[in-house]
Amino acid sequence: MSTLHKVKAYFGMAPMEDYDDEYYDDRGPSRGYSRPRFEDDYGRYEGRDFEDPRRDPRADMRADLRGEPADYPPPGGYRGGYPDEARFQPREFDRADMARPRFGSWLRNPTRGSLAMDPRRMAMMFEEGHPLSKITTLRPKDYSEARTIGERFRDGTPVIMDLVSMDNADAKRLVDFAAGLAFALRGSFDKVATKVFLLSPADVDVTPEERRRIAETGFYAYQ
């Protein structure tokens, strides 16, 4: 094609069939859109390019033919397939512990081992003629009952003061009174349990073992 024809074709002065060069090919596609309008190079990226490399396409095809869901591998964050566990699990309590009585168990379950005491010796502590056989337990409600404690102790009777039901202020006053009373009459004043004290006259010798047994058996609670 000559230069003159090219100029004419450029300005639309030459027929299109005369415009023949390497840029036009009769075998090429027509000017109409034979492909979808929005199809471009991005359409060449098919879904398989983004598939998980760990998946087997053949397994997916077989699952599709059987009508079953494809077996996908677990997500990366849960690799290992740990089984789900209940967040809150009921606690199993020992039925023996639940059935064990909370109060008075020391009567049915005697102390064993090095702290155990011969039942005969335990009975001898409170049998007639033993100094502790006439022991008495007083449970004052307020400080006004201090007189009763003093009279019993002055008569030579061992006294157990159970101050559990008293408020701390009155209990402290009564403890101070009993300690002074025991000192004045040459007796002894010992703590047996929490807010429980034993006043022993001068002629009554209460050994540490006997005091421990009084506390362990709760003897003062049944008088």
Swiss-Prot record:
Q: Does the keyword Cell division apply?
A: yes
**Superkingdom in the source lineage:** Bacteria
Annotated GO biological processes are: division septum assembly; FtsZ-dependent cytokinesis
Q: Which Gene3D superfamilies match?
A: SepF-like protein
User: Which cellular component appears as one GO term in the record?
Assistant: cytoplasm
Region: Disordered, residue numbers = 19-81
> Keywords for this entry?
Cell cycle, Cell division, Cytoplasm, Septation
Q: Where would you find this protein in the cell? A: Cytoplasm
Q: Where is the composition biased (Basic and acidic residues)?
A: 36-69
Q: Which InterPro entries match?
A: Cell_div_SepF, Cell_div_SepF/SepF-rel, SepF-like_sf
Q: What does this protein do?
A: Cell division protein that is part of the divisome complex and is recruited early to the Z-ring. Probably stimulates Z-ring formation, perhaps through the cross-linking of FtsZ protofilaments. Its function overlaps with FtsA.
Family, as annotated:
Belongs to the SepF family.
Query: Assembly state and interactors?
Result: Homodimer. Interacts with FtsZ.
Name recorded for this polypeptide: Cell division protein SepF
From what organism does this protein derive? Mycobacterium marinum (strain ATCC BAA-535 / M)
